[in-house]
Amino acid sequence: MSISFDLTIDDTRDQLARHARASLEAKPSLIGMSREEMAEALIKAGVPERQVKMRISQLWHWLYVRGVSDFADMRNISKDLRAMLAQHFTIARPEVVEEQISQDGTRKWLFRFPPRGAGRPVEIESVYIPEEGRGTLCVSSQVGCTLTCSFCHTGTQKLVRNLTSEEILAQLLTARDRLGDFPDKDTPDGAMVPAEGRKITNIVMMGMGEPLYNFEEVKKALLIASDGDGLSLSKRRITLSTSGVVPEIYRTGDEIGVMLAISLHAVRDELRDILVPINKKYPLEQLIKACREYPGLSNAKRITFEYVMLKDINDSLEDAKLLVKLLQGIPAKINLIPFNPWPGTNYQCSEWEQIEKFADYVNAAGYASPIRTPRGRDILAACGQLKSESERMRKSERLALEAMMIAGHGE
């Protein structure tokens, strides 16, 4: 049995009016700024230049180590400076519209971010997956997606916009809040989390969107997440998943240096063109070449290849043989993902016996090929199932909501 908490207020009109006021009063967030950007912003706000380096150090500690979301809690900063910071900036968390808890302990949050410019509030989903000794947060990089992968639920939602570095990091910060993963924060009773250490040990850019189509903001967010003075996550514990944006794979290795995962799903171009249409632009030969040249590959730093198991589509023994041949010489792990059904799909999950035969062949060839245990299926939180709640509404409901938003924004 799953549990769902609808955290929205009852009166939608009041909620939309609040968003309208927020858009008019919008202040830049310090969350997600690089040190250079923060220095420029602080000087512009009136912080003496000689103090800027010290103030940045203090702010990073409070934002990313202590996890505060109110300037008033920054106790080693003077009251006057806290007031000045609050006047010019925000460090508020996004609205948590809904929290769903699966029977297996997986948690899914629906976040709502305020309007940007003349836009509307947007919603995205993040998922927390607890396991023995680790807790993984699946983070979104876009509202919707442009890739239209035929087996993926997110691919049925049109791209609304890219998320900012602030909005990407806000998913991690808010999840840590709600799991009690910051000092002085309590873990919810009964929550499934690692028994010791951090509640969130790993992050994966595998939520809504294609991270490499939002490269600069994703890069900024991940460099802060891995900064020793920031959230201090090892780059070995951060995985970026891409459907194959080849030029940015090279940039990811050179400029970010996190672990790489490839949404592969097919070993023949003619099939991958259908399942993952970006393959028409960057076919398998180009994709695999970029993988072979990814910096620092070794048995300790392997590329993960994700392969969704689709009945009678890509699950034959011949597909397994071609997969092994395709990846020959690349330090790799192959995650076999039982297809997670969603409303309206025409695909079916492979038979379990066939998945095991496929895995056995790949294992025998020397590649680790774990079969991923489906997590959070009962709350549509499993791989390929994410989609903004507002996008699940009937068209008439969505148009009514948008009309109210327009009225609330005075457009």
UniProtKB/Swiss-Prot annotation:
Disulfide bonds join 138-383. Its EC number is 2.1.1.192. It catalyses: adenosine(2503) in 23S rRNA + 2 reduced [2Fe-2S]-[ferredoxin] + 2 S-adenosyl-L-methionine = 2-methyladenosine(2503) in 23S rRNA + 5'-deoxyadenosine + L-methionine + 2 oxidized [2Fe-2S]-[ferredoxin] + S-adenosyl-L-homocysteine; adenosine(37) in tRNA + 2 reduced [2Fe-2S]-[ferredoxin] + 2 S-adenosyl-L-methionine = 2-methyladenosine(37) in tRNA + 5'-deoxyadenosine + L-methionine + 2 oxidized [2Fe-2S]-[ferredoxin] + S-adenosyl-L-homocysteine. Residues 131-380 form the Radical SAM core domain. It is found in: Cytoplasm. Coiled coil: none annotated. Specifically methylates position 2 of adenine 2503 in 23S rRNA and position 2 of adenine 37 in tRNAs. m2A2503 modification seems to play a crucial role in the proofreading step occurring at the peptidyl transferase center and thus would serve to optimize ribosomal fidelity. NCBIfam families: rRNA_mod_RlmN. This is Dual-specificity RNA methyltransferase RlmN. The gene is rlmN. Belongs to the radical SAM superfamily. RlmN family. The lineage of its organism: Bacteria, Pseudomonadati, Pseudomonadota, Alphaproteobacteria, Hyphomicrobiales.
